[in-house]
């Protein structure tokens, strides 16, 4: 019989092997917050294990081995993290990044290794969307490959993606955002504590109206927050999840990735998120379709909006403003975090050109040519009647006397006429 210690080691090894694949249920909170978070900006601290798929993406400085929180991310499985593409606008080298899993508290600028149950990992590969537009933040989505694979456990677990047939999320869902970003717009550095906030999904037509974002939002975005502001994501929350569920007890589904906004918690300037459902095929093409087996069942209600079109025309400036938090102050400090007071307004929409006039109708076919006139009646071919013998004899006598004759209006020489006349038979006078 094996000693108890050996059996315990075997059991732990089997559990660790199963957890290392992160094949368990997705979207489940290991510890619910009984108070329910209401804010990130000025908000409520999340308890450890409340959002086990949350990842802190940290800039690493080799000269002093320090790490600085910059963006959030979502754990999909033991090998991949989903985040925002704009986090890597200025930091694309894999050795510049570290990932911390299972954290509730983080220390900005620390050089200390993490302690269990937290896990620190390297970035093996950065995969940004091939049509990401840093000017408009279109297709603001990216994937990070984890090395070595991270094991799931009590405070680390995968997030759910929506079903490919579910379409856009319904507005009636309960949604949360979470992150270590700024707790107010002009904060000097990110929050050391994971914050959470409950937000409402806002209709895209309202969010795109003139007094709000004035046409900047595309069909591949989600708009979440409150019309009056006050509760919002902020700098340092980029790449983190917008998580929703329809009913109590159901798993949370990552419906969006924190992308951009104007300021933080401003009225009529809610947070803008990259919707995940339009990019499921792209994610599967990069990490394998098997990695999406944890997607929630399809929503019975058919989608209410069409799939996204492609891109907004580029503007003169980036739209800001949940860019990642300012990095280490030396040697390459990031710009001051205070955003521009308003996003660049896109040029006024021009009226569509009038449709070209219809082509003129084809001309009517020419009338058929008139029928040819009937041919004149053929000239009579009746031979002239022969002159009587007495008449011919009289004409001969006149010729012999030197006379001439006329036929109609045409003058005829009598000598030639006599030569052309019908030969007169010889007359013999009886003696």
Swiss-Prot record:
Glycans are attached at residues 19, 208. Residues 342-381 have a biased composition (Pro residues). Disulfide bonds join 22-152, 26-160, 71-87, 175-244, 207-223, 234-264. It is an enzyme of class 3 (hydrolase). The active site is at residues 86, 140, 238. Its EC number is 3.4.21.10. Residues 1-16 form the signal peptide. Acrosin is the major protease of mammalian spermatozoa. It is a serine protease of trypsin-like cleavage specificity, it is synthesized in a zymogen form, proacrosin and stored in the acrosome. Heavy chain (catalytic) and a light chain linked by two disulfide bonds. Forms a heterodimer with SERPINA5. This is Acrosin. It comes from Oryctolagus cuniculus. The lineage of its organism: Eukaryota, Metazoa, Chordata, Craniata, Vertebrata. The gene is ACR.
């Amino acid at each position: 019989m094996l000693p108890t210690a050996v059996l315990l080691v075997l059991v732990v090894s089997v559990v660790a092997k199963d957890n290392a694949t992160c094949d368990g249920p997705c979207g489940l909170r290991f510890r619910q917050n009984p108070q329910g978070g209401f804010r990130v900006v000025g908000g409520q601290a999340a308890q450890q294990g409340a959002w086990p798929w949350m990842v802190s993406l940290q800039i690493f400085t080799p000269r002093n081995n320090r790490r600085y929180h910059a963006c959030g991310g979502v754990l999909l499985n033991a090998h991949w993290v989903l985040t925002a593409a704009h986090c890597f606008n200025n930091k694309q080298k894999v050795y510049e990044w570290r990932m911390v899993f299972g954290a509730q508290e983080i220390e900005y600028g620390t050089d200390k290794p993490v302690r269990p149950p937290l896990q620190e990992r390297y970035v093996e590969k950065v995969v940004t969307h091939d049509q990401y537009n840093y000017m408009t933040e279109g297709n603001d989505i990216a994937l990070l490959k984890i090395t070595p694979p991270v094991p799931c456990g009590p405070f680390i677990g995968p997030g759910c993606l929506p079903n490919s047939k579910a379409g856009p999320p319904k507005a009636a869902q309960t949604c949360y955002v979470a992150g270590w970003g700024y707790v107010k717009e002009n904060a000097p550095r990110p929050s050391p504590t994971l914050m959470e906030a409950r937000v409402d999904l806002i209709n895209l037509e309202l969010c795109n109206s003139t007094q709000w974002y004035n046409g900047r939002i595309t069909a591949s975005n989600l708009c979440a927050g409150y019309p009056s502001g006050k509760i919002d994501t902020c700098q340092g929350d980029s790449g983190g999840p917008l998580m929703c569920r329809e009913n109590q007890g159901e798993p949370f589904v990552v419906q969006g990735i924190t992308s951009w906004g104007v300021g933080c918690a401003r009225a009529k300037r809610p947070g803008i998120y990259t919707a995940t459902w339009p990019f499921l095929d792209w994610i599967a093409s990069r990490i394998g379709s098997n990695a999406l087996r944890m997607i929630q069942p399809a929503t019975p209600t058919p989608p209410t909006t069409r799939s996204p079109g492609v891109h907004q025309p580029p503007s003169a400036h980036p739209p800001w403003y949940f860019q990642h938090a300012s990095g280490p102050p030396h040697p390459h400090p990031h710009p001051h975090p205070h955003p521009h007071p308003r996003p660049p307004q896109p040029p006024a929409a021009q009226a569509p050109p009038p449709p070209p006039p219809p082509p003129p109708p084809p001309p009517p076919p020419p009338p058929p040519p008139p029928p040819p006139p009937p041919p004149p009646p053929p000239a009579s071919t009746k031979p002239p009647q022969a002159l009587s013998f007495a008449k011919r004899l009289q004409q001969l006598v006149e010729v012999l006397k030197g006379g001439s004759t006329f036929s109609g209006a045409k003058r005829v020489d009598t000598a030639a006429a006599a030569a052309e006349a019908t030969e007169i038979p010889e007359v013999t006078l009886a003696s």
